[in-house]
Amino acid sequence: MAYHYENLKLEKGMYSQSGRSFAQTLEALDPSENYKGTSLEGLDAFQRQLKRFDIKVKGAGSDRVEKFFWSTESAVLFPEFVSRVVRQGMEEESILPDITATVTNFDGMDYRSIASTPTEEEKKLKRVEEGAQIPQTTIHTQENLVRLHKRGRMLVAPYEAIRFQRLDLFAVTLRQIGAYMGRMHLEDAVKVLKDGDGNNNAAKVYEV
């Protein structure tokens, strides 16, 4: 049986689709739902492309870095591989999700949030008698914009230095980079919890 993923045309321009990541672009061209009930169920579009080019990225039998560059199309997959492994390092053992209410993705350098700031009395859900007015909770936009700070790391390595390295070993370094980035994100989050985001919402200070 022929599958669509085997004939998909991979190009570098797939990374520059407006409002879409490379993985989302791949998924749109080769939806995972089409593989339900097949041996490929459970793989996403990127993982199917790894299978297409027979690139093994984990375990004792993992391939060398150079295998990504055996063709121009398989080379297109390398940045996504790096991105995924770095993200894995950011998320491993991270407590950031435990102190984050929600995640918002957007394009821009600053962000205006919304908030509800009820008093202690307004937080109480009191009994409402028949015909009486129901108490209201007000949601409003924050007065000040939250300015975002860009963080990043450029990975520089001569091809000769990494081409013969196994992908699972190369991934260790990438996960370390991700862990460092995750630590910085956590520090940023704790600072906002402590000092606020510029909207007069710093944490209360208690003296013991």
Regions found by a protein language model. Name each.
Residues 65-151:
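Assembly/oligomerization interface modules of large self-assembling protein complexes
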Residues 24, 48, 52, 67, ...:
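Charged/polar, solvent-exposed surface patches and flexible loops
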Residues 153-208:
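Alpha-helical scaffold segments that mediate packing/assembly in large oligomeric complexes
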Residues 22, 45, 111, 134, ...:
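Polar low-complexity intrinsically disordered regions enriched in Ser/Thr and small residues
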Residues 1-73:
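Intrinsically disordered, low-complexity terminal tails
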Residues 8, 48, 55-57, 67, ...:
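Hydrophobic transmembrane signal anchors and adjacent membrane-proximal interface regions, especially
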